[in-house]
Amino acid sequence: MQSNLIPHTHKHLSLLTIYRAPFGKFNKFLTQLEEILQTIRNLKLDFIICEDININHLNESSKRSQFDAVLMSYKLISTVTFPTRTENNSNSTTDNIFIYTFMFENYTVSPSIKRLSDHNVQMIIIHIPQRQLDVHLTCYNILLI
């Protein structure tokens, strides 16, 4: 698993990016993810997760259920409901953006046409009136060949 936490102190929002290889050890990934989420919770950071963990969110599966359960325990929800990758006439949503259910209620997620990658770009715009700012965050998952 590869992850980065990018603090954005001006708007008090951090971005956690996560990548899990398709054939990585899933249980180890879940353990590491929980450790990272617990650390972030202890630091009291507001954050968003952009991920490519190679679990198709369009289909029900054991891995998806386990992953979703971990995120739900931290009050994080999936926002991407459209395919993020199309290959051989098959659609999948292996990339996603997760946000806090209690903090970000007014948001828009939209796809953007792929230009640099085999995945489509997901863009999220979060409207936060109580803080008098809008957070614009674009999550790119780029495969370099």
Where are these regions (language model features)?
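Active-site-proximal beta-strand elements of phosphoester/diester hydrolases
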Residues: 3, 10-23, 48-50
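Short, solvent-exposed loop/turn segments at secondary-structure junctions
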Residues: 20-22, 54-56, 103-104, 129-131
